[in-house]
Amino acid sequence: PIRWMVALLNNEVLDIDLEGIKSSNITRGHRFLGEKEFEVNSVEEYFEKLDKNFVVLDQHKRKEMIREQAIEVAKSLGGEVELDEDLLEEITFLVEYPTAFYGEFDEEYVKLPKEVVTTPMKEHQRYFPVSKDGKLLPNFIAVRNGDSNRIDLVKAGNEKVLRARLADALFFYHED
């Protein structure tokens, strides 16, 4: 949903009303990291202030940030990230300020067929699998919308959710 609208032409605010939302030169940064509201008076200032307020506006830059971070995180685990381009695209548009991190899951799951593990990882949780020499590792890479502050809590929460998903997958694999 549209919550506010910035509309400028030659540094002047355009008078636009869209479904009761009036245009202005006031916008906001990242919901948790940026300023609540700030004024912009030009396109250049818009990009500059959003960047300072933890919003990477350029989707191509955001996508490359995610790609590069995921590759580096996987390397730190001694593996390679399985970068599904459709998933990468989806995550790019789910976050404003991406920070990739890794999580772990029980090694018993890597004995299952790869798709049984990677499907809930990718389809339900939006995680990237990590492999080494074509074999799945008991790790995943997730992308947080924010900085690395308290990433340990974010990691623990993501691991907990994936454990439940994988337990379900294991159950259905054995039942079917």
Task: State each model region's role.
Residues 1-176:
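Amphipathic alpha-helical "coupling" segments that flank catalytic cores
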